[in-house]
């Protein structure tokens, strides 16, 4: 049997500890999960880091809605990446798009540079891209380690064929 990764999205200390005790091998820390997730509070991260010993990936998303960020929002995101990196985040979960549904390479490069040695996950902004296969290639070239996707569908079961094709191309 192959080893799998069980990543659980959490938004509180209690849910992080429950995920850890339940066998999660890493967590994705967000706030506002009910609206798709936003950047969590730094103090929440620090408290969780003190109570669990598995990798913590941190969502960097300053607001709900689309993934097209203004320069001011991008500036905030860069600072958030720096702060979480400095506090010991294992990965940052990011995604920035252009209005035409393509990856915003300029913003992504800056966020990735700011992340330093942290691993990079491209979040579900990927599902909003106009061409998944081109976006995946761009993400790989940028140094993205992981992509979160439902294959552009409401869930991964429905999007399984697209996900399979993406895995084959990768």
Predicted regions and their residues:
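Glycine-/Pro-rich loop/turn segments that contact NAD(P) or position catalytic residues
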Residues: 129, 136, 140, 148
């Amino acid at each position: 049997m192959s080893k799998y990764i069980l990543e659980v999205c959490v938004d509180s200390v209690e849910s992080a500890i429950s995920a850890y005790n339940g066998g999660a091998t890493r967590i994705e820390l967000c706030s506002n999960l009910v609206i798709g997730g936003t950047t969590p509070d730094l103090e929440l991260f620090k408290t969780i880091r003190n109570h669990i010993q598995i990798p913590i990936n941190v969502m960097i998303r300053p607001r709900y809605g689309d993934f097209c960020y203004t320069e001011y929002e991008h500036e905030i995101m860069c600072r958030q990446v720096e702060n979480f990196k400095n506090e010991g985040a294992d990965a940052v979960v990011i995604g920035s798009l252009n209005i035409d549904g393509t990856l915003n390479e300029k913003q992504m490069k800056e966020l990735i540079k700011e992340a330093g040695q942290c691993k990079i996950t491209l979040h579900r902004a990927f599902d909003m891209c106009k061409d998944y296969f081109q976006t995946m290639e761009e993400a790989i070239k940028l140094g993205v380690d992981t992509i979160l996707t439902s294959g552009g569908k409401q869930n991964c079961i429905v999007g399984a064929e697209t996900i399979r094709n993406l895995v084959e191309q990768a």
